[in-house]
Amino acid sequence: MRAKRTIGLLMLTLSLYGNASIQVLHTASEVKSALPAAQPGDTFVLADGNYELSWLKLSCQGTDEQPIVVQAQNLLGAKVIKSGCITLENAAYIEFYGLDFDMSATSSFFKLQGAHHIRITRNRFRMSVDKEGQTSKWILVGDIWEHDTCASGYNRIDHNLFLHKSDGGALIVIDGAHGSPGGISVHDRIDHNIFRGNSPRVANEKETVRIGVSDLSMDSSYTVVEYNLFEDCDGDPEVVSVKSCCNTVRNNTFRRCLGTLCLRHGFNNRAEDNIFLGEGKTAVYEEEVIGCGGIRVYGKDHTVSGNYMEGLTGYKWDPAIALTNGDASNSVSTSSKHFLPENVLVSGNTFVRCISTLEVGFTNNEKYSKKPKSCRFEDNLIVADTQAVTMHTAMTSSNITFSNNRIWLTGNGTVGMSYTASQFTLLSACPALPAIEDRIMTDQNAGPYGSEDEDQPTEGLRGTDTTANGKKYFHNGQIVIVRGGVRYSLLGTRL
C-alpha cells in the first residue's frame, strides 16, 4: 500500500514540476539525509510518526516557480520531538507545511539566517519547560549576528498554532545583522496565526511578536502582522513590540492579553483595524494590579486608526491609548530610551467601556520629562462609564489636539478634561457601534485548521496562490492540488 502511494505521489509531482522529485520519508535519519540535498521543486512528505531531527541545518534553495516543500502526509500527523532546531542559512524558497512541533527545551524551533522566501505554515508549536531559567525564541528571523548586511526578507509565518509558551524569551522575533552598517529583515509577513497562552508575566523579553531591536530601530522593516489571534498573551507588557520603522499591524484580535501593542522604537508605523477585548481580566504582578491594554506609542509619524477596544482593564502604561511622556527627543539614535510621541495620529477608533480610554503624559515617577508633541486625537467614538481622558501633566495644543470626537457617558462617566464642542460632542443616547463579529479572528479563520476561501487569491510565498494548475491550497483538512481543472488530494485521489 505504501509503495502504491509513493508511486501515485511521484506521478502527480512529475506531472506538475517536470524533473522535480518527491520522496515519502518515514524516519528522522531519512529526513536528515534527504533535505540537505534538496533541489528546486523537490517535495518531501513526512509520514505519520515521530521525528527527532535534532540540529538540522539547511542551505538549499528552491525557486519562485519550484519551491522546496517539506510537509506532513496528514495535517499535524508528523511530529517533531525532543530538542533541536531547524536552521536555514542562506536558504530560499522552502515551505514547511502541516508539521507538529512538540519539543523539549531548545533555543528555537526555526532560526532563519540570511534566508529569504521561507514559508512556515499550518504547523503546531509546543515546548516543555525542563529547567529553571529556560529561555527560547521560537522563531528567529534575521541573519548571522556579525554580518554587515542582512540578506533576510520576504518570509511568511502563517496559519500556525503557538501553544502556551511558558519559558523566557520572545516567541517570534524579526531581527537582522548587527555588523557595520547592519540591517534588518524586510517585507516579512506574520498572518492568520493563533497565539494561545504566553505566561507567566516577566518584566521584559517575553513579547509574543517583536519586530526589530533597539540598535536596528532606525531601519525600515516593512513587516506586516495581520489577521492573527492573540489569546491570554500575558508574558510581557508588550504583547506585540515594534522596534523598527515602516511596519503595519492590522486586523488582529487581542483577547484577554495583559499588555499592549507597543510602538516602542522607530518611526512611521501603523496600527489599524485591530480588535482588543479585555473581557474583565486583571492580575497582580509585583504587588500591583495590571490589566488588558490597547496601544502604547513612542516615536514619531505613527498612525493609530480604525481600532475597536472594549472592556479593557489597564491604566497608566496600559490604557486603551497611552501617549506617555518620553525620556529622549526623537532622533536617528538607536538608543533604548523612550522617544517622546510626536506627530502621532489617533483617529477613527472606537472605545467601549474601557477603564481608561486615553492617558497622556505619564511621567514614570518623574523619569520621563519630555511631553508629547503635535499629536492628534480625532474622529474617535467613546462609550465611557469612568473617566475617559487622563492628563498626567498640563498639556497645550502644541502637545496634543482634539477634534470631532463623540462620547456617550453612562453611570459615573466623565470626559476628564475641559473641552469645546469642536473637540467632543456629548451624545444623548448610545451610538451605533461598529459590527465586529465577522472581524474577530477565531480557530475557524486562523491556525492550522483555519479556512481559506479557495476562490480568493491570497498573497503568499510565491506572490499569489490561486487554483491554477499545479498550485496547492488547503481545503476541508486536506492538501489539495489542481490539475487540469480537477482537484486532487496530495496522494493523487480525485476529490
Model features per residue range: what roles?
Residues 414-463, 468:
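Surface beta-loop-beta hairpin patches that serve as ligand-binding interfaces in beta-rich domains
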Residues 8-17:
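Bacterial N-terminal signal peptides
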Residues 1-8:
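Bacterial N-terminal signal peptides that target proteins for export
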Residues 55, 83-88, 102-119, 126-420:
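Glycine- and acidic/polar-rich repeat regions and solenoidal domains
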Residues 451-485, 491-495:
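Residue-level detector of functionally pivotal "anchor" positions at catalytic/ligand-binding pockets or at interdomain
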Residues 18-22:
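Boundary at the C-terminal end of the N-terminal hydrophobic targeting segment
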Residues 23-29, 45-54, 58-109, 119, ...:
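Right-handed parallel beta-helix/beta-spiral solenoid domain characteristic of secreted/periplasmic
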